[in-house]
Amino acid sequence: MIKNQSQAGRYGDFGGQYVPETLMTELQRLDRAFQHYRQDAHFQEELTDLLNNYANRPSLLYHAQRLSDQLGGAQIYFKREDLNHTGAHKINNVLGQALLAKKMGKKRLIAETGAGQHGVATATIAALFGMECDVFMGKKDTNRQALNVYRMQLLGAKVHPVTTGSMVLKDAINAALQEWTRRCDDTAYIMGSATGPHPFPMMVHEFQSVISVEARQQILDQTGHLPDAVVACVGGGSNAIGSFAAFLDDTSVELIGCEAAGKGVQTPLTAATIERGRTGIFHGMKSLFLQDKAGQIAPVYSISAGLDYPGVGPEHAYLAASGRAQYVGINDDQAVQAFELIAKVEGVICAIESAHAVAYVQQLAPTMRRDQTIICTLSGRGDKDVAAIAKYRGVTIDD
């Protein structure tokens, strides 16, 4: 569907560039560089080498046989992005954007982060490339993801707790955009999700598409046919757009994004943007956002720090509006139960974000035939979430 995007960075009615004039020139410079280097054979060779020999690609497509048997119905295959270096899909995009920044002569990387995985990936590649790194993270998220805060600091990054607004991911993005506006001459903003002004959604789509390019070939090699469904969690939407990208033109493949319903889609404590959101402009893009009656961005909630974003990337808004993909809400209880299930049945402790996708697979698989297949992306590993899940279950873990 990327070919349907206009030069202005539009996905149907969504996307675009809604930024201060001070950033417009830098965005245009970034777009020109991206369009040049995406066609540059040497750049692609360098990126592929880093993905394969540093980030540990290709990631496995693993047949979850015991889970498939227990649920009955479809055969379930996990795309194991949790096995990448740094433990999540985030490094795919960071390598691409940071390599581009290096080619542009930038000396410093900045990023926002929610669960901390994008911050860790950015700090990791900044260390690899010998660049400065500053990461902005909501104060609430620094508290619930303290391990990742220390990992970023260990990697040489400065972590800036954001104490404005709700002190979560949207506020971290605000702070990062403000910092980029202040200092864009030597600084590259590494956008972590498929959000923001053009060309960020297009760049994230391209650099994360390696997930589905690999998965498509792997499922053909293992089963001889395309999957019947691809399932991935959605906050801003980077791992989901990467999981969907190579299947967009395969109309027989159902694409399903799983949003964080929090305490319930119909409650105020939710982050189910596509189901509950309205069209608006925020963070430099036109997309769907959770808003209050006055049209202001509403507070959101999820047990997952990586999914509690009040909007969604413009390509996801377009895919939902066009009917090419469907989006469902998964509440905290369902996600935690799925987190525990695959740990016990498959020996995999996945990120709580990914567990939202697993929870929907639990519902979907039994409705399908045994000769049908589902690919479910495990976007990250769950080390960072174990303490929070224990607390959720009332279990005390001693220091």
Swiss-Prot record:
GO terms for molecular function, please? Answer: tryptophan synthase activity
Q: Which domain of life is it from?
A: Bacteria
The pathway where this protein functions is: Amino-acid biosynthesis; L-tryptophan biosynthesis; L-tryptophan from chorismate: step 5/5
A GO CC term assigned to this protein in UniProt: cytoplasm
Going by the UniProt record, its keywords in alphabetical order are:
Amino-acid biosynthesis, Aromatic amino acid biosynthesis, Lyase, Pyridoxal phosphate, Tryptophan biosynthesis
- What's the cofactor? pyridoxal 5'-phosphate
- EC number(s): the record gives 4.2.1.20
Q: PTM N6-(pyridoxal phosphate)lysine: list the residues.
A: 90
So what does this thing catalyse?
(1S,2R)-1-C-(indol-3-yl)glycerol 3-phosphate + L-serine = D-glyceraldehyde 3-phosphate + L-tryptophan + H2O
Enzyme class, broadest EC rank: lyase
**What SUPFAM superfamilies does this protein's entry cite?**
Tryptophan synthase beta subunit-like PLP-dependent enzymes
Q: Which InterPro entries match?
A: Trp_synth_b_CS, Trp_synth_beta, Trp_synth_beta/beta-like, TrpB-like_PALP, TrpB-like_PALP_sf
Quaternary data: Tetramer of two alpha and two beta chains.
Q: Which family does it belong to?
A: Belongs to the TrpB family.
Function as written in the Swiss-Prot or TrEMBL entry: The beta subunit is responsible for the synthesis of L-tryptophan from indole and L-serine.
Classification via PANTHER family: TRYPTOPHAN SYNTHASE, TRYPTOPHAN SYNTHASE-RELATED
The protein's name is Tryptophan synthase beta chain
The gene name reads: trpB
